[in-house]
């Protein structure tokens, strides 16, 4: 294949069935795009002039397919890298029920962005393509830099209503299969959280998760930091019923109605201000209520299975100081959104 021949454009004028049609296409894309880094030659630099003199490539999609797979990485050598997620290794291993997960690795990079637009539901991305050798080299540089911002510019919208997808108003129902999928999908988050907090060498006592789901994430945190006290809220009665065994202080409530006092929390995890969980408007409304709960010099850590809806720049407008923007998992050789902010 020639450089830039790898990414398939979607042409469908109507929505595709998720498993029977979309996933089938995504398997084709994966087979065309994926490479094992051990099979790719090492290079010791990239030639920017060469790349920017290449013929640009155009990739197209619609916002009712998988637009949330398109991501931007910035800054890298003063430029913006565009990429697109391909089928997740967790899906291939049957550990999640979604086609994609939160992790990004080298084969998902496309090249340097030239321009992008969204018009009449159609997304058009024009970029200067990387070779596989360049993808490997660039990714190996990016994965060492915790300040690189991963931004997902496009949201999935329902074909008929044009609205963003959200979870049910009463929250998720609980079932053992969902619990397993949620657990597998956040293994890398748990590992990175433990590593990051241990490196800070600070004793965070009151830990709050306003949408704690099964409570197992907080339970895992407490195992690693046994002196902490965990508070877990969730919209779903079923989830809180399960979480009772895993959280020090569980409560069924909507995060926007959180009863916690301002300046009462040392560390808050936000794992639900994400695409397909809440819509963008509500993500901001909820965040405005929640961030004052954290004490000065406390931390807010934000990530999720799907893209974070609040932009890094907007977090900063609320007076939060960014410490890192992404996490890295060595086992999967993957990066993912992992925002850590200090409260002024």
Model-derived features: positions:
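Conserved beta-strand signature within the Rossmann-like core of class I S-adenosyl-L-methionine
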Residues: 297-304
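A short glycine-rich, Lys/Arg-flanked "PGG" loop and its adjoining helix->strand segment in the class I
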Residues: 283-296
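N-terminal auxiliary segments of SAM/dcSAM-dependent transferases
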Residues: 2-47, 52-61, 65-161
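Class I SAM-dependent methyltransferase Rossmann-like catalytic core
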Residues: 148-196
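Class I SAM-dependent methyltransferase SAM/SAH-binding core
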Residues: 214-257
């Amino acid at each position: 294949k020639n450089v830039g021949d790898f990414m398939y454009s979607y042409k469908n004028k109507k929505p595709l069935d998720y498993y029977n049609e979309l996933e089938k296409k995504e398997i084709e894309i994966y087979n065309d795009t994926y490479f094992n880094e051990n099979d790719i030659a090492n290079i010791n630099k990239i030639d920017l002039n060469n790349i920017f003199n290449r013929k640009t490539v155009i990739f197209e999609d619609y916002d009712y397919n998988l637009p949330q797979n398109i991501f931007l990485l910035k800054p890298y050598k003063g430029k913006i890298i565009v990429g697109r997620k391909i089928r997740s290794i967790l899906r291939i291993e049957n550990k999640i029920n979604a086609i994609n997960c939160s992790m990004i690795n080298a084969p998902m990079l496309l090249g340097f962005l030239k321009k992008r637009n969204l018009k009449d539901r159609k997304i058009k991305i024009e970029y200067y393509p990387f070779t596989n050798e360049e993808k490997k080299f660039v990714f190996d540089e990016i994965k060492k830099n915790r300040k690189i911002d991963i931004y997902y510019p496009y949201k999935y919208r329902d074909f008929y209503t044009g609205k963003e997808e959200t979870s049910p108003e009463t929250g998720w129902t609980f079932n053992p299969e969902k619990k397993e999928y949620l657990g597998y999908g956040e293994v890398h988050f748990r590992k990175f959280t433990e590593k990051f907090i241990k490196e800070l060498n600070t004793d965070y006592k009151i830990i709050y998760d306003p949408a704690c789901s099964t409570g197992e994430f907080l339970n895992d945190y407490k195992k690693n930091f046994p002196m902490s006290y965990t508070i877990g809220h969730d919209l779903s009665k079923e989830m809180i019923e399960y979480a009772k065994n895993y959280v020090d202080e569980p409560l069924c409530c909507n995060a926007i109605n959180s009863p916690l006092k301002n300046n009462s929390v040392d560390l808050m995890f936000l794992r639900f201000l994400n695409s397909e969980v809440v819509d963008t408007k509500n993500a901001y409304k909820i965040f405005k209520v929640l961030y004052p709960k954290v004490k000065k010099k406390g931390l807010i850590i934000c990530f999720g299975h799907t893209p974070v809806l609040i932009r890094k720049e907007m977090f900063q407008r609320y007076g939060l100081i960014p410490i890192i923007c992404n996490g890295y998992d060595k086992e999967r050789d993957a990066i993912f959104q992992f925002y850590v902010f200090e409260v002024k």
